[in-house]
From Swiss-Prot:
The organism of origin for this protein: Thermotoga sp. (strain RQ2)
Protein name: Pseudouridine-5'-phosphate glycosidase
Binding site for substrate: K77, V97, S128, Q129, D130
Cofactor(s) of this protein: Mn(2+)
InterPro entries in alphabetical order: Indigdn_synthA-like, PsuG
Gene name of this polypeptide: psuG
Superkingdom as given in the UniProt entry: Bacteria
Length: 285
């Protein structure tokens, strides 16, 4: 198989993207997060398969050394569409949510974790492949909603149009990455068992969609969305395409004196914990 899977058979596993490490965080914090996520996986009894493309080789279960090499050498940011191109050209590539879900499903991983998903950008025709991949691949994705920089109304409507199931984990509101509230209601679940009951129903009715499990940022790290919106209005966009999200996230870190970075790290850690719990109980079911 073209994918080098380092997953130990029979153990629960969670797939994780590489874009969050390579393009979403400063190098020091990225490595610290990788180590913490690995520590959580050992404590909770699951495998964390960080997925990336190294010199054209798709790897599920990257090591810290490989991740550092990717950050040092540079890596394209790829969605599902670009996978065959970077593989054929022997490039390094960091996977987004869409590419991670696609590759995870090819090797039997059903649970994927991220911080925030892509969506519809404001003011231009720019729709993330995350949405289209979630509309056609059955998986469980644990996230803290969509990234706060997006057009919330348009993205929420697109999620409905694409028939992507949403459930709030101990919340009634759709979270917005750094922010716990959006004013948009979602069905609420209180425990992992309820998540799995919904997912098993999806299997029974053959619904080939990704179940979005929405886990809000811890309250003490929240940056209110109205504050994020005010800051975004002040930013002059200097890039386009796949560079927009990393550019804006970096600017927000600077403008909030690191508060959004702390929020990002906190929500990622909590999402890894929840995804691991789901994977462990899914394996037992």
């Amino acid at each position: 198989m073209i994918i080098e899977s380092r997953i130990e058979k029979g153990k629960p596993v969670v797939g994780m993207e590489t874009t969050v490490f390579v393009h979403g965080l400063p190098r020091k914090e990225a490595i610290e997060l990788f180590r913490r996520a690995k520590e959580i996986s050992r404590e909770k009894g699951f495998q964390l398969a960080v997925i990336g493309i190294l010199k054209g080789k798709i790897v599920a279960g990257m090591s810290e050394e490989e991740l550092e090499a990717m950050m040092r050498e540079g890596a394209d940011k790829v969605g599902t569409r670009e996978i065959p191109i970077v593989v054929a050209e022997g490039k390094n590539a960091a996977t987004t949510v869409s590419a991670t879900i696609f590759l995870s499903r090819r090797i039997g991983i059903e649970v994927v974790v991220t911080g925030g998903t892509g969506g519809v950008h404001p003011g231009r025709v720019d729709v993330s492949q995350d949405l289209t991949e979630m509309s056609s691949s059955r998986a469980i994705l644990v996230s803290s909603g969509i990234k706060s920089i997006l057009d919330v109304e348009a993205t929420f409507e697109m999620l409905e149009t694409l028939e992507i199931p949403l459930i709030g984990f101990r919340t009634d509101e759709f979270p917005l990455f750094f922010s716990r509230k959006s004013g948009r209601r979602v069905p609420r679940v209180e425990n992992v068992e309820e998540v799995l009951k919904i997912y098993e129903t999806m299997k029974e009715i053959e619904l080939e969609k990704t179940l979005m499990v929405l886990n809000p940022v811890p309250e003490e790290y929240e940056v209110p969305h109205d504050e994020i919106e005010r800051l975004l209005e002040k930013i002059e966009l200097e890039v386009e395409g796949k560079e927009v999200t990393p550019f804006l996230l970096k600017k927000l870190v600077e403008m909030t004196n690191g508060r959004t970075l702390k929020a990002n790290l906190a929500l990622l850690e909590e999402n890894v914990k929840l995804a691991g719990e789901i994977a462990v109980k899914l394996k037992r079911s």
